From Swiss-Prot:
Source organism: Mycolicibacterium vanbaalenii (strain DSM 7251 / JCM 13017 / BCRC 16820 / KCTC 9966 / NRRL B-24157 / PYR-1) (Mycobacterium vanbaalenii)
Compartments, record wording: Cell membrane
GO cellular component: plasma membrane; proton-transporting ATP synthase complex
Name assigned to this protein: ATP synthase gamma chain
Lineage start: Bacteria, Bacillati, Actinomycetota, Actinomycetes, Mycobacteriales
Similarity comment: Belongs to the ATPase gamma chain family.
Known role: Produces ATP from ADP in the presence of a proton gradient across the membrane. The gamma chain is believed to be important in regulating ATPase activity and the flow of protons through the CF(0) complex.
PROSITE patterns: ATPASE_GAMMA
Stored PANTHER family: ATP SYNTHASE GAMMA CHAIN, ATP SYNTHASE SUBUNIT GAMMA, MITOCHONDRIAL
Gene name of the encoded protein: atpG
Gene Ontology molecular function terms on file: ATP binding; proton-transporting ATP synthase activity, rotational mechanism
UniProt topology in membrane: Peripheral membrane protein
SUPFAM superfamilies: ATP synthase (F1-ATPase), gamma subunit (SSF52943)
One record GO biological process: proton motive force-driven plasma membrane ATP synthesis
Presence of keyword Cell membrane: yes
Length: 309
């Protein structure tokens, strides 16, 4: 009985220690959400505007540029999977990895071989454990990404994308680099504090997108004068466009990670509270039973002495 009481008290102490950790993680995540959400809201207009601008320029120039025109018989598609560096964030990583696997299946059905790039240690660990080749990975900034991080990733993706234009069959082209024909990104889209969902987006060749439910107005289209020529302009805008889209995705993923971690840690803290209450009640009952038994033994001993006299 004493051993059982000692075990219950040990479990109460363990649950209390875990509760302190989860509560601290919850508070840290809560403090980061507001800043992350503000960065998402600040980046969205620029990302939407550069996409809209390139779409309008494309319709005005009729330029046959790799950013705008899908290649014939695409063979490979780069997929950037954005995960977290740390755990304790509920189903955040599981959802984005499931979305990535669904995209891989879709690409293979279309005859395209996925070429894998990852952000975050969790995605790298997942694919490495399954012996899936990861061309390049980045880690250490999933919660606080910067534009420099996005630009580094974008430079790698753009190089692979532009190199894919001259590839022949399954072999590298004249530049000696085995490129890709499409660029995709899988990340967690931040909708609100309580709602985040995994999403897959194709960023090159461009897909015409309209913000919200807005549709292009009917009537005369805007005329553009290009200086320098359209091809030079698009060559300069391609890395910036990809970097902007990657940066927006990284910010959304960071905000979603903090929101998921806060929700998971709050649930863990509440569960620890419930467990401590249940264990405390069990310990009190055990202690009460122990005291009752001791009293019974004392009374029994006293009665035995009285009978002996």
């Amino acid at each position: 009985m004493a051993a059982t009481l000692r075990e219950l008290r040990g479990r109460i102490r363990s649950a209390g220690s875990i509760k302190k950790i989860t509560k601290a993680q919850e508070l840290i995540a809560t403090s980061r959400i507001a800043k992350a959400q503000a960065r998402v809201e600040a980046a969205r207009p620029y990302s939407a505007e550069i996409t809209s601008m390139l779409t309008e320029l494309a319709s005005a120039s009729a330029l046959d540029h790799p950013l705008l025109v899908a290649r014939e018989n695409p063979r490979r598609a780069a997929v950037l999977v954005v995960s977290s560096d740390r755990g304790l964030c509920g189903a955040y990583n599981a959802n984005v990895l499931r979305q990535a696997e669904e995209l891989f299946s879709l690409l293979r059905e279309e005859g395209k071989e996925p070429v894998l790039y990852t952000v975050g240690r969790k995605a790298l660990g997942y694919f490495s454990f399954r012996q899936r080749e990861v061309v390049e990975s980045w880690a250490g900034f999933s919660e606080r990404p910067t534009y420099e991080n996005a630009r580094e990733i974008a430079d790698t993706l753009v190089t692979a994308f532009m190199s894919g234009a001259d590839d022949e069959g399954d072999d590298a082209g004249a530049d000696g680099i085995l490129g890709v024909d499409e660029l995709h990104i899988v990340f967690t889209e931040f909708k609100s504090m309580l709602s985040q969902s995994a999403a897959a987006r194709r960023i090159a060749p461009m897909v015409v997108e309209y913000v919200g439910d807005e549709q292009p107005e009917e009537g005369p289209q805007t005329l553009f004068s290009f200086e320098p020529d359209p091809e030079t302009l698009f060559d300069a805008l391609l890395p910036r466009y990809v970097a902007t889209r990657v940066y927006a995705a990284l910010l959304e993923a960071a905000a979603s990670e903090s929101a998921s971690r806060r929700r998971a840690m709050k649930s863990a803290t509440d569960n620890a509270d419930d467990l401590i209450k249940a264990l405390t009640l069990a310990a009190n009952r055990e202690r009460q039973a122990q005291i009752t038994q001791e009293i019974s033994e004392i009374v029994g001993g006293a009665n035995a002495l009285a009978d002996a006299k």
